[in-house]
Each structure stands twice: as structure tokens, then as C-alpha cells.
Amino acid sequence: MAKEYSRTQRIGDQMQRELAQLIRREVKDPRVGLVTITAVEVSRDVGHAKIFITVMGQDNAEDIAQSIKVLNAAAGFLRMQLAREMKLRSVPQLHFHYDESVVRGAHLSALIERAVAEDNQHVAAAEPEDTKE
């Protein structure tokens, strides 16, 4: 049986696709790097939308904050373009946020790899002692 999605989830999914194309095509500001929209959360009343993004090639907080600032400044323009593309009665106000889950995931992955490497070293160090007995 197909999974049911709420109206706000369907709107969020469509907004994610449309915004990705609009940002790539229409936002020409050099301060905005390669933006990836990771998620869109639309409020129940469809009045506001949180757009979570990551920016490829920008690792320091200042560059990321600058990209967010530029996108929030362009939110009105992007909202107007979305209205043309999506044909909704009312298009939500756009609020861009940095998605830290990717950075957090990379950090956790590095911690796991380090723990596995240390465990392998302990196992390798313990093996010669076992073979001597």
C-alpha cells in the first residue's frame, strides 16, 4: 500500500525541487556557492516554510552565514517565482537555515572510524600474546 503524505509534505517536496532549480538559474550572487536544499518544512497553515540548505565548498561559518543572508534577502523574489511555478493560492514565506546534520553526520562517521581503527590496533596487539602461549 502506498504511503500517505500530508498536503504540507507534498508542498514541501515540490518546493524543494522548484527552489533548487530557481536558485541555480536565478540567483546570480557570487557569495552564494553551490547550494543543496536538504529539506523543506512547511507549517500546517502553509504560511511559513523552513528551507534547510548545505553549501558545497564553504566550510567556515562566515561564508555559510553570508550565503544564508543572501538567500534570505532573495526570499521575496524566490517566493514570487515559486508562485508562478507552483500555482498555489498562497505561497509560504521562505526562511533559509543551514542544515548542520550533514556536518554532524560526518563528525560521527569520523569518530566511528577512529574507534574501529583503535579497536583493530588493540586486537592486533593482543594477537601475538595469544600465539605465544
Swiss-Prot record:
Keywords: Cytoplasm, Ribosome biogenesis. GO terms for cellular component: cytosol. One of its GO terms (molecular function) is ribosomal small subunit binding. Coiled coil: none annotated. It comes from the Bacteria. Pfam families: RBFA (PF02033). It is found in: Cytoplasm. One of its GO terms (biological process) is maturation of SSU-rRNA. One of several proteins that assist in the late maturation steps of the functional core of the 30S ribosomal subunit. Associates with free 30S ribosomal subunits (but not with 30S subunits that are part of 70S ribosomes or polysomes). Required for efficient processing of 16S rRNA. May interact with the 5'-terminal helix region of 16S rRNA. Belongs to the RbfA family. Monomer. Binds 30S ribosomal subunits, but not 50S ribosomal subunits or 70S ribosomes. This is Ribosome-binding factor A. It comes from Pseudomonas fluorescens (strain Pf0-1).
